[in-house]
């Protein structure tokens, strides 16, 4: 190998330095590294007489020559060469460093501009990366190497140069400083290179950048500084706890006065660098102490600050595996037990302030409690189940909400917390819940009564979620009839003459239906047909509210989720789709026929019925996988087109959902599926009408709608073939189904280029370009 190694280098050099094909360059680099490894085998001492040294000599010489102008094109390939041969073994790394680093220092001192200096630092960073590969990081175990790291003799010079650039360069030279930061970070994590005090100096630099410097441009330097602190925390957590935490926590205010900018950046940084266990424990102690002080103040200021503290703790806990955390019981006692008691005190009016009466704070605290309850032992969960309404207090301290006559709004807001606690419990805890013996019929009835009468949105939503959670997760199969009877009783509460229901009652009906449909209860078909009947109500408010509520049934929810152990059957989406869609389609067809029949025999259908059914359709389709939709596309596409015909302000949400559905269909299946249904012209015409700022009298096309319609037009031109086929495969061969409407589209889009909204103009440019490039004119006949 040593005999021919230099000859091989001469051959491979051209492929790397003058790369025509990227894969050839990559293979050539792999060959160079393989030869370096082979020649390094059995070598324990560095010598210039080694075959390895003779092999590396022309390589390093060539690279040094190319690096004379490090900002030029061929310097990058030279860096790649140095990277692959230096990372092959400790001996090769030593030979490369001794040959390459001193000239780089000389070039750096003589450099006449920042561009050249930055390129030289990039080269050093490449060598630092190789050093990490060869010698490992602080966290690398085993693999002790007998050869000393050759970079050690340059340690002081590295520290001086990189520190000077990081903290001494002009603030506007962001990329230069980022390069220095990355190099400093690599050296700080390189095993046994810097002493702790030297890494600590780097940590101080990073803290100063984050705490004292103003943001520049896209904040790239600050983002890199945060990432660097997070990386150092894995290797040297004590430095972060001793240096960064005191500096950052000292900037947090004692109370929320003034702008959120005073504390949000600090909390965001602390959250991102505190995932490691030891550091998180420190973060928890510091922030929980801040929160406790705020809760004891009579005038703590805005609730945004304590909420931000809770959000920070929640974010970090979500990044960690809390089930394996050794301190989980401590967090449980402090947050779930301790803060829930504080919530009860606030609801009873005995707290010093109203922080824990705020629904947004309670929601964040609830999410935190939910995460912890899911992570604790069965015994702890049983404790939560027993205290889910009392919030770990006695009856003298706090009166739980269920069955309480006329509770205050503050008391009712505790339902937000109790709902999150319930969601975190396993199903096995169902028999330990209060008010469930012999069954939960009375509890469910109480919740329904509160749901239909509550007026505060946060409280109303908490009642709805808790009702659905109890029915879906904790109600046994044998007791399902309880929920089904309650569902029917709610429907029967309609006014016999006007057939109207209050919006709160309708939402209660749909959340109860959601609980039953997700678990595919025996009466699922009856439930769904009953919901559809509400859309046909002669009362417009009842019809419209019911139609908008169809998105609730399969919509994502943080409480009723798989994570929380809710019963969500795999076939629930298919069951809903196959039951409801044919009925909606049939009903719209009936309305269309009635609208065109002038016979006096046919009773006129109220104007709101058809838009309401289309609204329900869009709500359902927004939660249904495309694979279920495609077999029914010939039936659904005309309905989607009719949805785009709606032109009132109230239809914007429906049309937005319709455009989202169409975008997915086109992207996943190509324009051919639209063509097979025979609706290319109809679809394009409606999309163009939706892109118009002045589509006609009474028309409302919001900027979002206009941009979404343009996105669909763009997708039509880009995805003319189904996935898996070549771009030239079309039906009929060679002619695009979009060709007949190409001129119409280009003319219309030309007008949209003057839209007052920038996002719309950009979407129009993209769509017009796609049609010009992608929709070919018909081929001329050969003579």
Model-found features: residue ranges?
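Fungal intrinsically disordered, low-complexity polar regions
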Residues: 594-596
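Structural marker for long, regular alpha helices in very large eukaryotic proteins
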Residues: 1-551, 555-559, 563-584, 605-616, ...
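Intrinsically disordered, low-complexity regulatory regions of eukaryotic transcription factors
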Residues: 725-730, 734
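A beta-strand edge to alpha-helix "cap/lid" segment located at domain peripheries
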Residues: 782-783
């Amino acid at each position: 190998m040593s005999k021919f190694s230099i000859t091989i280098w001469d051959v491979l050099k051209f492929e790397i330095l003058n790369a025509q094909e990227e894969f050839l360059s990559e293979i050539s680099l792999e060959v160079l590294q393989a030869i370096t490894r082979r020649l390094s085998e059995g070598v324990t001492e560095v010598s210039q007489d080694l075959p390895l040294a003779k092999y590396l000599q022309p390589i390093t010489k060539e690279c040094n020559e190319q690096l004379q102008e490090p900002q030029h094109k061929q310097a990058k390939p030279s860096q790649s060469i140095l990277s692959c041969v230096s990372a092959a073994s400790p001996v090769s790394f030593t030979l490369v460093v001794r040959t390459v680093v001193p000239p780089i220092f000389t070039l750096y001192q003589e450099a006449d501009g920042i561009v050249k200096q930055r390129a030289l630092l990039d080269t050093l960073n490449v060598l630092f990366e190789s050093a990490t590969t060869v010698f490992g990081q602080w966290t690398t175990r085993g693999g002790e190497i007998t050869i000393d790291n050759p970079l050690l003799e340059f340690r002081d010079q590295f520290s001086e140069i990189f520190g000077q650039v990081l903290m001494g360069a002009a603030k506007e030279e962001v990329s230069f400083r980022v390069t220095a930061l990355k190099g400093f970070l690599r050296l700080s994590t390189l095993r046994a290179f810097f002493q702790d005090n030297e890494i600590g100096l780097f940590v101080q630099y990073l803290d100063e950048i984050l705490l004292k410097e103003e943001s520049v441009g896209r904040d790239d330097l600050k983002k890199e500084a945060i990432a660097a602190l997070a990386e150092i925390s894995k290797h040297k957590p004590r430095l972060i706890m001793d240096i960064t935490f005191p500096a950052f926590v000292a900037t947090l205010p004692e109370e929320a006065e003034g702008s959120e900018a005073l504390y949000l950046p600090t909390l965001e940084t602390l959250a991102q660098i505190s995932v490691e266990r030891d550091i998180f424990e420190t973060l928890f102690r510091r922030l929980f102490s801040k929160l406790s002080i705020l809760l004891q103040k009579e005038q703590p200021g805005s609730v945004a600050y304590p909420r931000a503290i809770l959000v920070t703790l929640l974010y970090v806990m979500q990044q960690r595996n809390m089930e394996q955390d050794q301190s989980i019981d401590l967090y449980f006692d402090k947050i779930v037990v301790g803060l829930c008691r504080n919530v009860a005190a606030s609801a009873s009016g005995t707290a010093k302030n109203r922080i824990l009466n705020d629904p947004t704070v309670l929601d964040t605290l609830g999410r935190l409690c939910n995460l912890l309850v899911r992570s604790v032992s069965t015994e702890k969960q049983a404790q939560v189940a027993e205290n889910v309404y009392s919030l770990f207090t006695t009856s003298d301290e706090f009166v739980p909400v269920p069955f309480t006559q006329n509770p205050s709004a503050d008391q009712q807001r505790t339902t937000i917390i109790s709902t999150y606690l319930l969601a975190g419990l396993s199903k096995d805890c169902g028999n330990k819940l209060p008010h469930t013996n012999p069954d939960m019929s009375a509890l469910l009835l109480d919740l329904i009564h509160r749901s239909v009468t509550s007026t505060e949105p946060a409280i109303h939503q908490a009642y709805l979620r808790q009702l659905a959670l109890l029915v879906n997760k904790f109600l046994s199969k044998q007791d399902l009839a309880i929920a089904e009877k309650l569902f029917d009783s709610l429907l029967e509460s309609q006014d016999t003459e006007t057939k109207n229901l209050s919006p709160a009652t309708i939402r209660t009906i749909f959340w109860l239906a959601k609980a039953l449909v997700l678990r595919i209860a025996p009466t699922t078909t009856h439930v769904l047909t009953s919901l559809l009947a509400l859309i046909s109500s002669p009362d417009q408010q009842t019809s419209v509210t019911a139609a908008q509520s169809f998105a609730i049934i399969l919509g994502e929810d943080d409480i009723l989720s798989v994570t929380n152990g809710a019963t969500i059957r795999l076939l629930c989406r298919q069951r809903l789709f196959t039951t409801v869609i044919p009925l909606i389609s049939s009903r719209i067809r009936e309305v269309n026929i009635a609208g065109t029949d002038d016979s006096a025999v046919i009773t006129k259908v109220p104007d709101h019925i058809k838009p309401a059914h289309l609204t329900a359709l869009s709500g359902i389709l927004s939660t249904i996988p495309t694979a279920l939709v495609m077999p029914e596309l010939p039936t659904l596409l005309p309905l989607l087109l009719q949805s785009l015909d709606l032109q009132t302000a109230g239809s914007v949400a429906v049309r937005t959902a319709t455009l989202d559905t169409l975008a997915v269909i086109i992207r996943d299946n190509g324009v051919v599926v639209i063509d097979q249904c025979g609706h290319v012209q109809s679809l394009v015409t409606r999309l163009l009408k939706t892109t118009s700022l002045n589509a006609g009298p009474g028309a409302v096309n919001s900027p979002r709608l206009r941009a979404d319609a343009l996105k669909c037009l763009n997708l039509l031109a880009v995805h003319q073939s189904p996935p898996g086929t070549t771009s030239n495969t079309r039906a009929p061969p060679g002619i695009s189904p979009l060709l007949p409407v190409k001129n119409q589209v280009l003319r219309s889009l030309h007008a949209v280029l003057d839209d007052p909204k920038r996002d719309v103009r950009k979407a129009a440019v993209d769509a017009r370009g796609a049609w010009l490039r992608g929709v070919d004119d018909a081929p001329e006949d050969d003579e």
